[in-house]
Amino acid sequence: MSTDFVLLPEPQQSIRLDGDFEVAAGGSISVGARPSASLHRAARKLQEALSMVGQRWQLTPAGAETDADVRASIAINPYHVPRAQGYRITIEPDFLGIVAADDAGAFYAAATMRQIAEQFQGTGRLPCLRINDWPDFLTRGVMHDISKDKIPTLETIFGLVDMLAGLKVNQFQLHSENAFAYRDHKIVWADGTPVTGDDILALDEFCRERHVDLVANQNSFGHFERWFEHDEYKPLAESPEG
């Protein structure tokens, strides 16, 4: 099988090992002791990634008896992976192991496995390798301006956040001038399709599940044209006549 694949961003260390790892029927994935909800989500993402390559494996608690052959594991151990948000992936012919520094690291490991799986989809096998990865910058953000022309739907924003999280972006700034439905300032957004408070709450939960901090970014007086065009707000302008 071809062993060429691309990872974005590139891991700090990536070494190709001899052999292949078969994702055959009857396997299972061990999930670390006392797992958080976040680790469970990372384990499910790993499960989905392996399913793209071969068979779907069940998730089992670490140390639990199971009829399935434990062929993979995902766990958190900051002693083995000391750098925040870091992770280690080891794929050998008979086992796939993931160890992460924290919940975020486990999520990023699963995201890396997803990228690998997409490039070996349907082959039934993965190349053996060892990856050690951690961020150079603990905060990695993207600002998205939703005030220019069409305001995106919540589903579109969800899709963007999901893609960015898969690329290990962990801060998402939603930049707005008149795109938020302020309760006491309806005249500013009444003719549009603004993002509502309920939308923001749903987006915040969606972001948190992907280890992304949602940051509000509201234009202020220097970029308030769509506010100052209304008589109620013109007194706030330094040059009300433009």
Tell what function each PLM region has:
Residues 137-242:
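Substrate-binding cleft of carbohydrate-active enzyme catalytic domains
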Residues 1-140:
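Contiguous, structured surface segment used for ligand recognition
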